[in-house]
Amino acid sequence: MLALLAALPILLVLALMLGLRWPASRAGIAGAALALLVAVVGFGLGTEVLPDVGLAGSLAGVAAEAGFTSATILWIILPALAIYHLQVATGGTDVLRVALGRLSGDPRILALLIAWFFTLFMEGGAGFGSPVALAAPFLVGVGYKPLVAVVIAMIGNGVGVSFGAIGTPIVPMVAATGFDPLELSAASAVYHLAFGIVPLVVMMYIASRGTGTRMTGSIWGWTLLAGATFLVPMWAIATYVGPELPTLGGALVGMALFVAVLLLVRRWRGVPEASEMDPGTADAGAGGPRTSGAPDALADVDTSARALLRAGAPYLILITLVLLTRLVPPVADPLDGVVLRWSLEGGFTGSFSPLTHPGTLLVLSFLLGALVQRAALPKLGGALTTTLKQLVPVTIALLAMLLLARTMVRSGMTEELAQAAAGSTASAWPVLAPLVGVLGTFVTGSGTASNVLFTDLQVATAEQLGYDTLPLLGAQNFGASVGNPIAPHNIVAGGATVGLTGSEADVMRRTIGITLVYAVLGGLLALLLV
């Protein structure tokens, strides 16, 4: 009975978002309100649980923890999105997109460059729906039908969400568990390293069918190369550097290696153009691929080395700052020593490292990048204004979900759910752990929010079953990433940019299969690791 009561807030959020199609902000508020009611009436928060501080002290502590964690996450989201909007305003994004498009006339190669490397790069730098919204129109511009464009961009982007927006999904996990960020990033990356090639192969199969061709031997080779050049650097960065740069840095390193090989092959042997490709590509019919490497409207964009450096300045500065503050002890040690901490009676605590926090590094990257790009003040103001407007529903949803999660933890509701899960699933829980992450992302539209909702459940269940906690937390973060291609919010945002509004179900039907396969593979690995 108590387990059912404990599950009610999560079930309510599911019902409101999936059944009534409420936004995450409204559903989160309703779920948080119900969680508070159940915590007080059903679990005795303030009387049987935390009696020393009483109900008022318990509610104040929960609100403080939720508000503090929300602020640390928003400190990342705000400058990350501001950089993205500044890039759009200054034309930096167009330069990067067109430079990729001019590398090959084969739309399947362009799918690797845009739906894989470009979306992963943007996911690492900004995340929160921007990669697919940006990549889908460009894929349509090089000839893919809108439905195919959104599907392959969603699948490609999903591999990098575990470390999206400079590692934002890891932040609530650190706050909830106390594990070192490096431990959590390493535990998450191993799943993508093992199976990340699977969604990429599916992505390329769909892209090839979209061009009226097949997965030929050469495309298999390019696909495997694209997978290896991203997944290996991503894993290495996550394991030895930290959670901020695996997706962004992995995409940058992988793209550089892939493009270098592409240019060498084109120079020595020639990359196939449309006329040299498999039958049906050059005349794929209405909506089929064009041979131009970039949309006509962007044909005159400057893609010289100087223009590319200027366009990528915010991200290059960010990478430099992250490496300096993580790998150079004379810089990192004194900065890490500045920590702000707070605590309230009842064991409510929080800490913040302002000088090395990813949000601070993003703010510096935004300001220095704007200087390099010589962005006018109106463009800076416009980027910030757009970002602040975009943050309103995100802030409400994030705070509501955190209130729900922290209420459940502090009242013992999460512990009760964990005991029920341990009793009913036993040895099968590791297989299900990634699917829990998928469910969270499906409901909330955010890998970060999924981790907010279910990190404590994963920890408590691991303790109940006697499993090693880190592999299950890695599986949670992995699942939160895997669920991105079926998140309705993300599908709506991506589809809207290419005129697919109202056809979201068609996208989901094409992404749900690989989502479930990828998650189950991760679950089988989790079973071995725990």
Question: Where do the model's predicted regions map?
Answer:
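Alpha-helical transmembrane segments of multi-pass membrane proteins
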Residues: 108-120, 145-159, 182-200, 204, ...
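Membrane-core helix-loop-helix motifs of multi-pass transport proteins
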Residues: 142, 154-264, 492-525
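Hydrophobic alpha-helical transmembrane segments of multi-pass integral membrane proteins
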Residues: 106-137, 141, 161, 395-403, ...
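Membrane-interfacial loop-to-helix junctions in multi-pass transporters
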Residues: 3, 70-73, 100-114, 142-148, ...
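Structural signature of hydrophobic alpha-helical transmembrane segments
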Residues: 1-8, 70-74, 126-131, 183-197, ...
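Structural signal for alpha-helical transmembrane segments and their membrane-water exit/capping regions
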Residues: 2-3, 13-57, 78-91, 261-269, ...
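Interfacial loop-to-helix junctions that mark the boundaries of transmembrane helices
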Residues: 1-3, 21-27, 59-71, 182-190, ...
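Transmembrane helical segments that form the transport core of multi-pass membrane transport proteins
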Residues: 288, 293-440
